[in-house]
């Protein structure tokens, strides 16, 4: 009986979750970002665009925590960087690319940056 009651309570509670799709726009009317929330917390795909309409950033959230591949693009549509993230923690190899799409810098051992590489992180989306 206790097990059945717990399942009922979980099912009842799940009906009260509020999922909302949110879009924000630049003053000029172009789409700036799109994401979903569950009970006010980001959950699902997050996307952000440059003013020119080109995708600038895409990531995934689970219960408000980054989880999955974070991708950042240059305004010309070329991938700028990829970050493998698991439950809010950077895991794996981060890759940075130049404006022509050539791999220019990576994070390797123990997910620590190679400090001999210099990269300009200003102007990221």
Which residues does each predicted region cover?
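Positively charged n-region of N-terminal signal peptides that target proteins for export
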Residues: 1-7
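Periodic aromatic/glycine/histidine/acidic cluster detector
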Residues: 2, 13-125
């Amino acid at each position: 009986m206790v097990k059945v009651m717990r399942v009922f309570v979980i099912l009842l509670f799940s009906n009260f979750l509020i999922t909302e799709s949110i879009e924000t726009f630049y003053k000029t009317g172009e789409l700036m970002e799109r994401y979903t929330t569950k009970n006010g917390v980001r959950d699902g795909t997050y996307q952000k665009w440059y003013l020119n309409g080109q995708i600038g950033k895409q990531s995934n959230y689970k219960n408000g925590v980054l989880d999955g591949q974070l991708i950042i693009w240059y305004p010309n549509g070329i991938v700028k960087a990829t970050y493998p993230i698991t439950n809010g923690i950077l895991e794996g190899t981060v890759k940075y690319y130049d404006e022509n799409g050539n791999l220019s810098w990576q994070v390797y051992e123990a997910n620590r940056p190679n400090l001999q590489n210099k990269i300009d992180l200003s102007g990221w989306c």
